[in-house]
């Protein structure tokens, strides 16, 4: 948590001196600091800085003081004098208020821009804030709300197109073609049309009247030409808007086209389905983060179906059909208390470092992953080590750096499995427990994995599976043989016991893909994608007859090491597989390439194809299935291995540009259907 001008422990009078020295404040700007403290915080500058610097934890603030601090910090930020980082504001202070009171009015209203000189008018359209997500699970919850709304309106959720854009960190405004307004409180804003009169241009040669957007400045230009005059880009933007007479550096920035108004409708974007969004989430976020040469503080995702937008509507604070993903880059330096081993479902023993309790990203952190025991050994991570850790929406943060390692004698490298006590063996960087048949951790984790991959069962999470194991259950066939009375005997209530039996029956009766069923057994290097590849060459029940040589020679994309791991894993699950297979699971077979010779004869056999955009003749999912049946491999993102990009309606510029750069064939939906003779 840093004050923009430097040391957070500076006395209040020196704080003002530093700011005024940097940008030569006008009288109005000097008054702003005093006005904010009097009107918003109601306490002295020293207290404000103590909170911002971390000398006073938000945990120990009254709700009234916490609210006052948020209001003061927001007002200073909007005026161009940020008191602390975006991450600290969002992940520490705002998160603490949300933890105490999720329905607090401050969280449900638009964060207003400071009142400025100029005509205040009704905005042509409400400018709301954007709801925020800090991890993938929050994005998933947002998606479930959209899916529910789509079902109620009779819309196929899988056909919806989602859009992602960079979230600009500039000065929000609305351009109606005649005037430019600040966002204000979302309903009324200040007329700042003189910014255009001063030469401000719309980005990319765009026209006026494109609605909401932000005034931003090129990052490289700011660093090279403006950093000596302004603490940060917000400060520059505020000066451009509010000053009666512009300073020469501001005029030059406008003339150079470094400062522009960027309408949201002109932002570079990603477009795709919900499944693509989840599968490529990190790639999409990182790609959009690099798309514009301006400061951004997140990525905005939204649906583009206007009818569904209208149905979902908005709160007083944000549109329900839109959400902003924000990454937290806060780092804390902590002391390691101990390193505790944990055994995974595949027998890998992972080190988890327990650290002194530290609040990071608004959460109290006590554990951080150390990845593998080679890292513990080589980097000296043990009791007393000092590490720097970060947390970006993950449950367990990660180690960024070992500041002070400990000696080898202080390291605790386990020799035995923490779950079953068996000897551990090194395999590369990892320690493994080889007792996969009776290790409690491997048994329970494997059960959880089975139901998670099936995806059609509720009620078999970690606590339920652990209770079943403690009640004597050690394998899945025995679980499927249980009746309601058996569940009650191990501690489940009558209603829950009945539900468990119903869920098990449901898992067998609902149709699922055969490759998903095989993937649920958790064979190393045999995830859902590889299972589907295998089953395009051999039927499910015959997969256990494959040799390493066959896999490498006959199936595209498998190397010797992978083939060896797969064959060894299949041998290990063979008996269990056929016990469950005999229970009559309803499985949809994967089309064989050799079946009727269709795949071998098709013009796309052996090709890697990516489908993008909304398809007209069939759903994208159906077209992908059909392509696989014709011998193609379907990808989700453009890579050097992609042979063909098939485009539907409303295609994102990102995939098109990447395909063109890599020289990949681009076909319209109609051209593709003619190629494979679907029309």
Swiss-Prot record:
UniProt keyword Disulfide bond present: no
Catalyzed chemical reaction(s): NAD(+) + (deoxyribonucleotide)n-3'-hydroxyl + 5'-phospho-(deoxyribonucleotide)m = (deoxyribonucleotide)n+m + AMP + beta-nicotinamide D-nucleotide
Keyword Magnesium: yes
List of catalytic residues: 167
EC number: 6.5.1.2
Cysteines paired by S-S bonds: none
Similarity field: Belongs to the NAD-dependent DNA ligase family. LigA subfamily.
Protein's job: DNA ligase that catalyzes the formation of phosphodiester linkages between 5'-phosphoryl and 3'-hydroxyl groups in double-stranded DNA using NAD as a coenzyme and as the energy source for the reaction. It is essential for DNA replication and repair of damaged DNA.
Protein name listed in UniProt: DNA ligase
Organism, as annotated: Desulfotalea psychrophila (strain LSv54 / DSM 12343)
Encoding gene per record: ligA
């Amino acid at each position: 948590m840093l004050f923009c001008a430097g040391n957070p422990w500076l006395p209040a009078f020196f704080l003002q001196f530093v700011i005024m020295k940097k940008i030569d404040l006008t009288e109005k700007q000097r008054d702003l600091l005093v006005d904010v403290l009097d009107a918003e915080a109601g306490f002295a500058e020293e207290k404000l800085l103590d909170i911002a610097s971390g000398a006073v934890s938000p945990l120990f603030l009254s709700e009234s003081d916490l609210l006052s601090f948020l209001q003061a910090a927001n007002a200073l930020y909007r005026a161009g004098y940020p008191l602390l980082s975006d991450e600290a504001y969002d992940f520490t202070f705002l998160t603490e208020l949300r933890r105490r009171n999720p329905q607090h009015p401050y969280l449900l209203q638009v964060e207003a821009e400071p009142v400025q000189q100029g005509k205040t008018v009704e905005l042509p359209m409400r400018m709301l804030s954007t709801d925020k997500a800090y991890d993938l699970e929050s994005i998933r919850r947002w998606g479930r709300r959209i899916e529910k709304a789509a079902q109620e309106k009779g819309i196929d959720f899988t056909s919806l197109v989602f859009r992602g854009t960079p979230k600009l960190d500039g000065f929000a405004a609305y351009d109606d073609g005649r005037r430019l307004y600040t966002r204000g409180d979302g309903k009324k804003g200040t007329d700042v049309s003189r910014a255009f009169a001063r030469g401000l241009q719309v980005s990319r040669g765009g026209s006026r009247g494109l609605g909401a957007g932000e005034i931003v400045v090129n990052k490289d230009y700011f660093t090279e030409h403006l950093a000596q005059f302004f603490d940060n880009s917000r400060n520059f933007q505020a000066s451009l808007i509010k000053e009666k007479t512009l300073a020469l550096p501001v005029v030059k920035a406008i003339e150079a086209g470094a400062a522009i108004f960027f309408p949201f409708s002109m932002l570079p974007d990603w477009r795709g389905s919900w499944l693509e969004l989840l599968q490529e989430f990190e790639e999409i976020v990182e790609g959009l983060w690099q798309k514009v040469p301006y400061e951004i503080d997140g990525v905005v995702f939204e649906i583009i179906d206007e009818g569904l937008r209208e149905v979902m509507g908005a709160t007083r604070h944000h549109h329900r059909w839109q959400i902003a993903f924000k990454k937290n880059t806060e780092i804390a330096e902590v002391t390691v208390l101990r390193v505790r081993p944990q055994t995974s479902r595949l027998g890998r023993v992972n080190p988890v470092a327990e650290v002194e309790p530290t609040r990071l990203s608004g959460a109290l952190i006590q554990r951080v992953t150390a990845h593998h025991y080679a890292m513990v050994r080589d980097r000296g991570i043990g009791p007393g080590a000092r590490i720097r850790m970060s947390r970006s929406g993950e449950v367990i943060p990660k180690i960024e750096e070992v500041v002070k390692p400990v000696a080898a004698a202080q390291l605790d490298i386990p020799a035995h499995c923490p779950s079953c006590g068996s000897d551990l063996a090194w395999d590369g960087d990892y320690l493994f427990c080889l007792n996969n048949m009776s290790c409690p951790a491997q048994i329970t984790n494997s059960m959880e994995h089975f139901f998670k991959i099936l995806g059609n069962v509720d009620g078999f999470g970690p606590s339920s599976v652990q209770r079943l194991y403690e009640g004597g259950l050690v394998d899945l066939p025995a679980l499927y043989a249980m009746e309601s009375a058996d569940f009650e005997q191990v501690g489940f209530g009558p209603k829950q016991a009945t539900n468990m039996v119903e869920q098990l029956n449901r898992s067998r009766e609902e149709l699922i893909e055969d490759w998903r069923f095989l993937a649920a057994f958790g064979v190393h290097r045999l995830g859902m994608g590889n299972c589907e590849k295998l089953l395009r060459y051999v039927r499910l029940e015959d997969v256990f007859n494959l040799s390493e040589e066959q896999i490498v020679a006959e199936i595209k994309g498998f190397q010797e090491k992978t083939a060896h791991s797969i064959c060894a894993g299949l041998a290990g699950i063979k008996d269990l597989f056929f016990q469950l297979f005999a229970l009559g699971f309803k499985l949809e077979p994967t089309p064989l390439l050799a079946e009727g010779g269709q795949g071998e004869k098709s013009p796309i056999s052996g090709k890697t194809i990516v489908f993008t955009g909304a398809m007209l003749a069939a759903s994208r999912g159906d077209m992908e299935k059909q392509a696989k049946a014709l011998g193609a491999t379907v990808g989700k993102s453009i890579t050097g291995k992609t042979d063909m990009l098939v485009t539907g309606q409303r295609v994102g510029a990102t995939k098109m540009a990447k395909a063109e750069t890599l020289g990949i064939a681009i076909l319209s939906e109609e051209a593709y259907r003619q190629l494979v003779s679907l029309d």
